[in-house]
Structure formats: C-alpha cells, structure tokens
Amino acid sequence: MSPNSRPGRPTVALIKWAAADGISEAIGLELAGLGYDVIPFQHDQPVPAAATVLTFAPHGRWWPVALQVGRLPAGDRPALIHWGTEGFPDPRTPWPLIAGLGRARSWLDALSDRPAAWQRRLARLPPVPALNRGLFRFRYVGDNLRAMRRGWLTGLADVSEWYARLYRKNGYPAQFVPWGTAPTWHADLKLERDIDVLWMGKRRNGRRSDLIDRVRRELAQHGVNMYMADGVERPFIFGEERTRLLNRTKLTLNVKTRWFNSGFTFRFHTVAGNRCVVVSEPFLPHVSRYQAGEHYAEAPPEELAQRILYLLAHDDERRALAERAYQLVTTEMTLRESVRKLIALPVPA
C-alpha cells in the first residue's frame, strides 16, 4: 500500500510507461478525483499491492505486468484492468489468424520471463529477437487473450467500439470505453486565431506524409500556410505550449496512417477542448458519438484542401463546429467519465 494511502479508500496501482508519462498522470488525477488512492509504478518494476491494477496502451512489454499478477495466489490477486489504446491488426484478417499469430507472438515475447534458463537462452537466439521486433499489434491481442484465458485479466476495454466488438464476437468480453478529454489539455486563452491550419505529430509512413504534403501544396496555391509541428520543420508540441498553439489555430488536419487507423480519437480530444476544428479524411466508426458535420469536418483525401478553404471562408460554420465539439468533450466525453466507466468494469466471480 502507498505510504500516502488513507484507510478505507480503494487503492489503484497505475502503470507508467515512461518516467514522465503525461497520459498516466492525467488518468491518475481523474482516479484521485473519483476517490481512489493512486500508486504509480513503472511498467518494468514490481507491481505494488493494491485492490486494482490499471494498465493502458501498451507502450512497451505488458506481459510481465500480467505475469506478476498471475503468480499471486488466486485469493490474493488484485483486479487487473487493461484499457487498449494502441489499435488492432488489420480487421480484414480472419479472426483465427489474428488470434493464432497473436498468441504465438505473445508466447515468443514471454520467453525471456520463463523460469527455466534454457527457455530464457532461447529468447536470445535467432530468429526470436528479430521476430520480437515486429507484429506488435498481434502481440497486444495475444497478450490479452492469454491473460484472459488464465483468469488474470479481469477487465478488458478498448477505446474503439469496432475493436471491442471484434473481441466480443469471438468470445472475449471486452467493453468499449471511449477516450476522453482531461481538463489539463485545454484552456480558453482568448487569443487571436492567427494560424489557419495546423499539422502536429509524426508523419509515420509514406501514405500519411504524401497526403499532408499534397494538402499543404494545394492550400499554398490559395495563399494559405500550414503550420508544421512534425518534429522536422518544428519540434513536437506538448502541454501548455500545445494548448497555447491550439488556441491560436482555426483548423487542425487529421490524416490516417492506415485505412483502419483509430488515431482521430486522440487528436480530437486534444484539439476540440481548445475550440479548434479537426478536418479529417473518413475513418472507421470507432466511436459512433463523433458525427461528421456536427463535431468535426470530413472530406475525401482529394477534397481535404477544398474543405479547409471552405471553412476558412465561412467563419460562422467553423465557429459552430468548434463550439459543438467543445461541448461534447468538456461535458460528456471527459476523461473523468471514461475512467469512471473503466474502473467499474465488472470483475468475474
């Protein structure tokens, strides 16, 4: 138990994927606001004693955390709740292949945690290290399936309705818990919106990079500049600097890396609380509550620049979109509400 825990208050051990993990800190603040004593722990360190262990992402190896919980006597195990935020393999892949590859990838990753020395040596022999450097999304699924089968993972949620439904369809009781907006991610700074269009984040792959450049060229032909915070032209933006920049920005571009990508969710909840409008290409209905034309602007890839130009020329429409999105993410789809749903996931008897 944390030395700062107070008697009678439920305890939650909350994972941190880095020494400075802003997402974990935001979730921890919401848990504290809901009346929980929060015990942060690094993902590669011992899991502290608590009534509940809460993990998310993952941004590294998750299996050792589940293994620590699983090695405890059944009567002493905490509830282990995991909130998937890192996506899924291509959903066109047949489920038996997703599950089979996922379990195999998870098993390979877990070799280094085995008690037998020969198994740990096997983890260092080719081609195991090379295999462990790929197929991450399969590993995420495989870890979840193996931990649920063993009874260690008592609550599984995903930020995508689509992915949660895939789990349930195949016999795994995953729940949809949407991402939410934290109060520390937005402010009304009443600044002049002197930036027309913003791109923030990594380009990641050729598909996304090419489309960003295309939209940028087409806007430039009409005298509109795109502010680039891509880690190349300008540094990535975080915290107060990001909030300030979003308060100066009218529109933020969203471009997928893959056709099934769910990244819009995180961009939307970062942007909308600052009354900045997201302009996006179409994406899968990961969260049905988001409505194109109601909370964000949408256009096919080849029409994104034209949609941006239209909104810049019709300021009343842009402001109305911004206000509806702001109300959604600050009153209904907050991080507090998401964490409340997450921590209340049913624990099997």
Language-model features: locations:
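Nucleotide-sugar donor-binding catalytic core of glycosyltransferases
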Residues: 2-51, 55-76, 82-269, 273-292, ...
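C-terminal "capping" alpha-helix adjacent to the active site of nucleotide-linked donor transferases
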Residues: 300-317
